[in-house]
Amino acid sequence: MAATHNFLMENELLDLDNLDAAVESSRKALSEARESLRGIEQSISDKKNLRKVVSDYRRTRPTIDAHKKLSGKKAEAYYRANEADFIIYEAALRQLKVLAPGKKLPATSKLNTEIEALISEKNAAYNTYRTAKAEYEQLATAKRNAEQILHGTPSRQKKREQER
């Protein structure tokens, strides 16, 4: 309790209205940091998915091109032998139409660079989030303790004794 009083004195939060405002401001900052972090994580996930789809497309494209050159029974036999590649190619093509409609295929190196930049941004955002969370937890704890001091709320130990 003394630590709470010292914290409130140092930060000039002895007035409950100021303390409530500080807690609310800290909660909003925490919420904004969390949303920013989630947005960056979603962007990373989207880029990684696009990279996988492009990789699948590029890996299976030679099989499709070789099939186009064949005809008759050779084409049928080739299709049956490489059916998994055809399925992967068609799925990748459908996803590419959704993820990058009417665009050229992005270079894998460009995607990797974008992912690395997003990961760096995510790390910075996480540091901001961690700082905001620690500040919020400290203020929320101070508020609970201050309310307990002012309103004389029984401590957990006293509540347990009363229950017995």
Where are these regions (language model features)?
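Extended intrinsically disordered terminal tails
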Residues: 1-164
